[in-house]
Amino acid sequence: MPTINQLVRKPRKSRSSLNKAPALQHNPQKRAVCVKVYTTTPKKPNSALRKVARVKIAGYGSEVIAYIPGEGHNLQEHSVILIRGGRVKDLPGVRYHIIRGALDSRGVQNRKKARSKYGVKKS
């Protein structure tokens, strides 16, 4: 533990909080272009084929992996999409979500509940 004299000479530094979605550069969403659309498997207790896309963020150039939520999608290489922050707990390295129903990403078909999260208009 430091003495009072040591604290007077060099005060304590406050820790800066860690940014969980640095590629968004403090923006709520960013436009991006799909580089590769593929499936991957989750961590140990879970088993599935999760749909993800490697995307290049417009005007920034960094490539990140983004999750494609919902059942079925129409994304392919060169699709222009909108991404938001939000990790997927069982997929390491996936820290972004693709927003369904925005730009080239179509909303989920036949979705009745939680429609706003999947870009579906009221039928």
Curated annotation (Swiss-Prot):
Which intervals of the chain are annotated as region Disordered? 1-26
Quote the subunit structure annotation: Part of the 30S ribosomal subunit. Contacts proteins S8 and S17. May interact with IF1 in the 30S initiation complex.
Q: What is this protein called?
A: Small ribosomal subunit protein uS12
GO MF annotation, one: tRNA binding
Residue list for modification 3-methylthioaspartic acid: D90
Protein's UniProt keywords contain RNA-binding: yes
Which Gene Ontology terms describe the biological processes this protein takes part in?
A: translation
Question: Per UniProt, which keywords does this protein have?
Answer: Methylation, Ribonucleoprotein, Ribosomal protein, RNA-binding, rRNA-binding, tRNA-binding
Q: Which organism is it from?
A: Ehrlichia chaffeensis (strain ATCC CRL-10679 / Arkansas)
